[in-house]
Amino acid sequence: MKVKPSVKRICAKCRVIRRHGKIRVICEDPRHKQRQG
């Protein structure tokens, strides 16, 4: 899980979603997981 000030999709399978007021990226590749911090 990377915590970044701005989250972006890295590949075509990345999905940007909003959970509990936090913006997250979920993907099949575990290295692409991010959340906004």
UniProtKB/Swiss-Prot annotation:
Q: What does the record give under GO molecular function?
A: structural constituent of ribosome
Would you identify the family this protein belongs to, as annotated? Answer: Belongs to the bacterial ribosomal protein bL36 family.
Q: Which GO terms describe its biological process?
A: translation
Any keyword Ribonucleoprotein? Answer: yes
Protein name as annotated = Large ribosomal subunit protein bL36
Q: Is this entry keyworded Hydrolase?
A: no
> Which InterPro entries does this chain map to?
Ribosomal_bL36, Ribosomal_bL36_sp
User: HAMAP family attached here?
Assistant: Ribosomal_bL36
Q: Which GO terms describe its cellular component?
A: cytoplasm; ribonucleoprotein complex; ribosome
Q: Which UniProt keywords apply?
A: Ribonucleoprotein, Ribosomal protein
